[in-house]
Swiss-Prot record:
<feature type="binding site">
    <location>
        <position position="269"/>
    </location>
    <ligand>
        <name>FAD</name>
    </ligand>
</feature>
<keyword id="KW-0479">Metal-binding</keyword>
<dbReference type="GO" id="GO:0008823">
    <property type="term" value="F:cupric reductase (NADH) activity"/>
</dbReference>
<feature type="binding site">
    <location>
        <position position="383"/>
    </location>
    <ligand>
        <name>FAD</name>
    </ligand>
</feature>
<keyword id="KW-0812">Transmembrane</keyword>
<dbReference type="GO" id="GO:0045444">
    <property type="term" value="P:fat cell differentiation"/>
</dbReference>
<dbReference type="GO" id="GO:0046872">
    <property type="term" value="F:metal ion binding"/>
</dbReference>
<dbReference type="GO" id="GO:0031901">
    <property type="term" value="C:early endosome membrane"/>
</dbReference>
<feature type="binding site">
    <location>
        <position position="148"/>
    </location>
    <ligand>
        <name>FAD</name>
    </ligand>
</feature>
<keyword id="KW-0560">Oxidoreductase</keyword>
<keyword id="KW-1133">Transmembrane helix</keyword>
<keyword id="KW-0186">Copper</keyword>
<comment type="function">
    <text>Integral membrane protein that functions as a NADPH-dependent ferric-chelate reductase, using NADPH from one side of the membrane to reduce a Fe(3+) chelate that is bound on the other side of the membrane. Mediates sequential transmembrane electron transfer from NADPH to FAD and onto heme, and finally to the Fe(3+) chelate. Can also reduce Cu(2+) to Cu(1+). Plays a role in systemic metabolic homeostasis, integrating inflammatory and metabolic responses. Associated with obesity and insulin-resistance. Involved in inflammatory arthritis, through the regulation of inflammatory cytokines.</text>
</comment>
<keyword id="KW-0406">Ion transport</keyword>
<feature type="transmembrane region" description="Helical">
    <location>
        <begin position="236"/>
        <end position="256"/>
    </location>
</feature>
<feature type="binding site">
    <location>
        <position position="171"/>
    </location>
    <ligand>
        <name>NADP(+)</name>
    </ligand>
</feature>
<feature type="binding site">
    <location>
        <position position="307"/>
    </location>
    <ligand>
        <name>Fe(3+)</name>
    </ligand>
</feature>
């Protein structure tokens, strides 16, 4: 016979491990899962229900009573019902006075109501100590015990003692409570579970746009042009050849765009002469998305590496190699060895391998489990110094790939240069601008600005002895 979820966990604990009584209003999925977890951790659980006689599938060892009776059994009450059903609490206002009322509700969409559910609850039951908590934990995670992905619990409330009690409960359940302040923060906490990759949207849209643009650009040069001029069918290039051009171009462009906002911010600070003015919203959001941009770029670099590995087994490549070998045998002609070509080929491969290795290192150090083990200087060294070195290597990899064809007019098709030349525009611009910013005369002033000096401040004169480096 198959065991139920409640049977899979031992719910019997010693009296010395008893934590107290907790009341849960609501017998839905979340209420039952939270009650089961509390029973496992030694709490006595009393459920409050509008129909206690018909409530079923509750954890073994828990009681089910009506709301008023359940409220009288504990001074900590978890409200596991939706906001639409808060009306019954007005009748229990006297019974709930002085009790800790934990609101775990979420809405269907962000900013659905003018005020947060917790603030509305505090207005509805003014005598209770309302605390917002546990709304970022799913019922499935509580029931299955897989809390690794959602272990943090945001807690906010106006009463510090009530918050401390809720945070103690969270720690007993094996969770990590984070104090977010007063109930004013409840709206932000309620919006948090409703967010869908907010910091990934801009990188996703940008990378998608770049991919589409470069794919169409390469298709015009390598598929449409041969068909228009010579009726040659080159559509097979759409599967491997063109994607293997698009992926590295997109990766290099995104990597450059990771460091471009920092340069723009430095230029803006130099122009303003102060760090105490906010950046434009678009630049601020761009800087916040740099980690996501870098990880997306790393993903495209991985795709480029994988696509490159399958090149030798492609039919087109094997056909060209076999055909060239047969032609060479029939004509009895040998191609002379070119030392310069060998240098370019080996340098191109070496730069690509080193660039990809450092790229991978940047991605690893951006993981929270790794970044938490290093201090700020170490993290900045990897992400900034090694990051720019990665950009230099990847840009050099692309330059050497072009080799002698870089400025050759023969590579123009319908006056369109090769796609890799377009890929070099942003990286080279970033590197040139960075080189200018690290010049001592500019870097010294920028450092002072970031340390609090202001060019137009009345204290700036004495700080720089009446002189500026710019």
């Amino acid at each position: 016979m198959e065991k139920t979820c409640a049977d899979e966990f031992p719910l019997t604990v010693d009296s010395s491990e008893k934590q107290g009584v907790v009341c849960i209003f609501g017998t839905g999925d979340f209420g039952k899962s939270l009650g089961l977890k509390m029973l496992q951790c030694g709490y006595s659980v009393v459920f409050g229900s509008r129909n206690p006689q018909v409530s079923s599938l509750l954890p073994r060892g828990a009681e089910v009573l009506c709301y008023s009776e359940a409220a009288s059994r504990s001074d900590v009450i978890v409200l596991a019902v939706h906001r639409e059903h808060y009306d019954f609490l007005a009748e229990l206002a006297d019974s709930l006075k002085g009790r800790v009322l934990i609101d775990v509700s979420n809405n269907q969409k962000m900013n659905q109501y003018p005020e947060s559910n917790a603030e509305y609850l505090a207005q509805l039951v003014p005598g209770a100590h309302v605390v917002k908590a546990f709304n970022t934990i799913s019922a499935w995670a509580l029931q299955s015990g897989t809390l690794d992905a959602s272990r943090q619990v945001f807690v906010c409330g106006n009463d510090s003692k009530a918050k401390d009690r809720v945070m103690d409960i969270a720690r007993t359940l094996g969770l990590t409570p984070l104090d977010q302040g007063s109930l004013v923060a409840a709206k932000e906490i309620e919006n948090y579970p409703l967010q869908l990759f907010p910091m990934w949207r801009f990188p996703f849209y940008l990378s998608s746009g770049l991919c589409v643009f470069f794919f169409v650009y390469c298709a015009i040069r390598e598929v449409i042009y041969p068909y228009v001029t010579g009726k040659t069918d080159s559509t097979y290039r759409l599967v491997v050849s063109i994607p293997n051009r698009v992926f590295p171009i997109t990766a290099l462009t995104l990597l450059a765009l990771v460091y471009l906002p920092g340069i723009l911010a430095a230029i803006l600070q130099l122009y303003r002469g102060t760090k105490y003015r906010r950046f434009p919203n678009w630049l601020d959001h761009w800087m916040l998305c740099r980690k996501q941009l870098g990880l997306v770029a790393l993903g495209f670099a991985f795709l480029h590496a994988i696509y490159t590995l399958v090149i030798p087994i492609r039919y087109y490549v094997r056909w060209r190699l076999r055909n060239a070998t047969i032609t060479q045998a029939l004509t009895n002609k040998d191609s002379p060895f070119s030392s310069s070509t060998a240098w370019l080929s080996d340098s191109y491969l070496a730069l690509g391998i080193l660039g990809f290795f450092l790229f991978l290192l940047l991605g690893i150090t951006s993981l929270p489990s790794v970044s938490n083990m290093v201090n700020w200087r170490e993290f900045r060294f990897v992400q900034s110094k090694l990051g720019y070195l990665t950009l230099v290597l990847c840009t050099a990899h692309t330059l050497v790939y072009g080799g002698k064809r870089f400025l050759s007019p023969s590579i123009l098709i319908w006056s369109l240069p090769s796609a890799y030349i377009l890929a070099l525009i942003i990286p080279c611009t970033v590197l040139v601008m960075k080189f200018i910013l690290i010049m001592p005369c500019i870097d010294k002033t920028l450092t002072r600005i970031r340390q609090g000096w202001e060019r137009k401040s009345k204290y700036a004169q004495s700080t720089l002895n009446g002189k500026s480096d710019i």
